[in-house]
Amino acid sequence: MADPVAGIAGSAAKSVRPFRSSEAYVEAMKEDLAEWLNALYGLGLPGGGDGFLTGLATGTTLCQHANAVTEAARALAAARPARGVAFQAHSVVPGSFMARDNVATFIGWCRVELGVPEVLMFETEDLVLRKNEKSVVLCLLEVARRGARLGLLAPRLVQFEQEIERELRAAPPAPNAPAAGEDTTETAPAPGTPARGPRMTPSDLRNLDELVREILGRCTCPDQFPMIKVSEGKYRVGDSSLLIFVRVLRSHVMVRVGGGWDTLEHYLDKHDPCRCSSTAHRPPQPRVCTFSPQRVSPTTSPRPASPVPGSERRGSRPEMTPVSLRSTKEGPETPPRPRDQLPPHPRSRRYSGDSDSSASSAQSGPLGTRSDDTGTGPRRERPSRRLTTGTPASPRRPPALRSQSRDRLDRGRPRGAPGGRGAQLSVPSPARRARSQSREEQAVLLVRRDRDGQHSWVPRGRGSGGSGRSTPQTPRARSPAAPRLSRVSSPSPELGTTPASIFRTPLQLDPQQEQQLFRRLEEEFLANARALEAVASVTPTGPVPDPARAPDPPAPDSAYCSSSSSSSSLSVLGGKCGQPGDSGRTANGLPGPRSQALSSSSDEGSPCPGMGGPLDAPGSPLACTEPSRTWARGRMDTQPDRKPSRIPTPRGPRRPSGPAELGTWHALHSVTPRAEPDSWM
């Protein structure tokens, strides 16, 4: 007679697929072990989830059970585990050092005293850190089997194993006869051993057949997997003569497979060919199947590829149809698509540092090619997200938008900058380059000042503008009316030029009118200066020196050597601030302390340039013995309303009181406009 245990092991080895459901019965085993330990020691361990392992994490329950097994072994005649373990049972926190020490003590006892195989052992981290709960459960089941041989209470699964073993060892003529030898020793408790709790009886098998039929009825295939009932809890599966033992463990239908247990659902998934080749019977299982249904588009497109990225993913949608079919069915009118919601003329991508000519080169030559290729096919170097396939796309940017883009870029550029770097770049379209350069020359003009003080308007491309850079444009003589005529013929106003660019464009005047305007401004400055000097001369401030014998003026600042308007403003501001003698005196007539020297910074100028400190008196001893000395004064600035600089400077020696005279700087501005009025032009 063949060994029945070998037949059960062979049925597990002949499965269609590898054994992957070893974790399916872990939850059922944890529930069984929790009930077993609660019955032995009156604990309150939860059966499901992480509560069971959390209750065992301290190791006290494990060590307590080890001592119980040792005491049961002492009652036997055979020398079984002869030494217990010492452990800490009070104030133990899961994950602490004492908890780890208790778990390690139990592991050492199982390995040395109980002789548990190494394949069923677990490590400390497996229980404390939940790294491998399956090993913990299998080790506890093995310890329960060893304890059941000594007369201890066994879990329900161990009782099922004992029932199955008795049924397999029973002879056919006498099925009710008890097994002899080792089986009697294992199941009967040792004499004299006290009862350790109520004995758990096997569950009733009356509902087992109904549960099995319910699980088999989930498969709706015409040719179902055969599972024939031989007796209570014994079934023959498939076309072979292999027998399986089925038991009910609470809400789980368990199957005895080899030396362990498995659920009936996973057992059928491994052995039923219909369940192996289809995923309809296992919707919650994440296993990889041999057949994976793919999404197929209901309408096939005649083109192999679509220029719109992502159209393959939307091919299964019924409302998406090919362009060719859409044109034949609906005519020239195209139904709305998600891509049609984008603006019709998307702006080209501009990077920081791009010049105007580089932007025009990106829109001149390649623009026509892109507009021609948009509606023909998927020929693209880089797929654009804003292209549409319904109708031929229009050019991405009309010529009018070219000037608008230049205006946007010129907002952050200085007005006095010379020709941009775009003039040195090669442009594919010469006509567009010439037209864009002419617009730049007409729109941006620079003020050029010669050595003799003459001012004139110069196009940006003709002069360096003080920056030292030159452009390859050829200087051309233009008449005063030429820019206006060319500007009217320019297509920019017709195509919607930005109004802001018109206001930023300097006024174009005739050179003669410019010179006449400058002369009027100079005459107005001189007239105002004379009027202010006349008002200031009414106040008695001391003898006014003769302009003919005025001392040599100090070297003025280099920033005002070539600027006629700036020097004129110096004289005006000097007259407004009054005489320096008034500012250097106090209420009692004595000279006050010298005022703080002004900074040379153009942003921190003084509103009164004539004020600088006490001046030399003609009759004072210091004026006779010491030659005239030039005092450092603050540079005049274009911002007279600003306060003087706070930078401290050394103070000079005080001079005795006496009649003050006009400062040399004020005398210079009061004489020079009268003496040489034509030199400023």
Swiss-Prot record:
Domain Calponin-homology (CH): 27-148
Residues with the N-acetylalanine modification: 2
Record SUPFAM superfamilies: Calponin-homology domain, CH-domain, GAS2 domain-like
Modified residues (Omega-N-methylarginine): 487, 504, 633
Ranges annotated as biased composition (Polar residues): 291-303
Phosphoserine: residues bearing it: 306, 316, 352, 355, 394, 436, 438, 479, 486, 490, 492, 657
GO cellular component, one term: stress fiber
Pfam families named in the record: CH, GAS2
Keywords of the record: Acetylation, Cytoplasm, Cytoskeleton, Methylation, Phosphoprotein
Biased composition (Basic and acidic residues): 327-342, 370-381, 404-413, 437-454, 634-644
Sites of Phosphothreonine modification: 193, 334, 391, 498
Location(s), subcellular: Cytoplasm, Cytoskeleton; Cytoplasm, Cytoskeleton, Stress fiber
Pro residues bias locations: 542-556
Quaternary structure, from the entry: Interacts with MAPRE1.
Family: Belongs to the GAS2 family.
PANTHER family: GAS2-LIKE PROTEIN 1 (PTHR46756:SF16), TRANSGELIN (PTHR46756)
Name this polypeptide is given: GAS2-like protein 1
Organism from which the protein derives: Homo sapiens
